[in-house]
Amino acid sequence: MITRLRALLAAWTSAVPVAAVVLLALTWGRDLPGAVVALVILVLAGAVLAAVHHAEVVAHRVGEPFGSLILAVAVTIIEVALIVTLMADGGDKSSTLARDTVFAAVMITCNGIVGLCLLVASLRHGTAVFNPEGTGAALATVATLATLSLVLPTFTTSRPGPEFSTVQLIFAALSSLILYGLFVATQTVRHRDYFLPVTRQGEVITADGHADAPPARTALISLGLLTLALAGVVGLAKAVSPVIESGVAAAGLHHAVVGVVIALLVLLPESIAALRSARRDRVQISLNLALGSAMASIGLTIPAIALASVWLSGPLVLGLGATHMVLLALTVVVASLTVVPGRATPLQGGVHLVLFAAYLELAVNP
């Protein structure tokens, strides 16, 4: 019975990513009728679950924190490609697309995913435990990247409006790449233990011990299917975005809600993977996924946009407004206080979720 279930799981998690990419190719750039939209949403949900499965297979093979890093970088690279493609298409709102998408990713990961994982882990296990050294380093990097890329443009004077000059944009891009590269080296080479799960006594857990690691061939196949699944998730989310826009407009909501919904869809694989780790009392893996995604979103998007600006026309607005800067500052302060003790109660999770709810509420009613 167990063998049959495993065979069935392997079959559908292999078929769905391929189906998602095929469906994406058939629907890209077309007006979709209601029945096709329903099919797209169904395949999108399947692709999310398949991505989580294959990410866990790869993570089991390479170990932590490499597994979390692979998923975060894979999602972000595809997301960056989508942003550049949409900006190349032009439009009135393309000038703020990179800023809105990156900030949405930061708020979703640092408040939504972190808050939910801390809440789930602390309710199931009493307290959520993690390594404050590694988590603090990740948070400091996210805060620095966000400030340099999203806050400073609001106050620079070389260009009118919240924009960087060419030299400033190059500096921000290089700084983002350097900081992200330093973090990856720290996470995977010099101080890998800082990013591994810990016991309640503070001892590092180097292996889960549930089962033997999958063969290299299986891991490579899962890596390829993971890439297909993530491409399908991001692309199908874009394919249904006109339907989302129509629904948001019909509900009388602000247009920024569209970006939030799409960002939520794109980050679903990481969100589910992080929650599953939190349920298993591996909160450090959850935080690696959340903060790693926020970091990759800024650290890879800004350099890509800087490079794309060579051929993209029109302004590139990166600076946040006052309301979003307040939310970002409060997020950094609260997250710092959460990280310092190395353990969290449901209160800390609730605080982050309230901040995320405030972000959503202000997106609906700016």
Model-predicted regions and their roles:
Residues 1-366:
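Hydrophobic alpha-helical segments, chiefly the membrane-spanning helices
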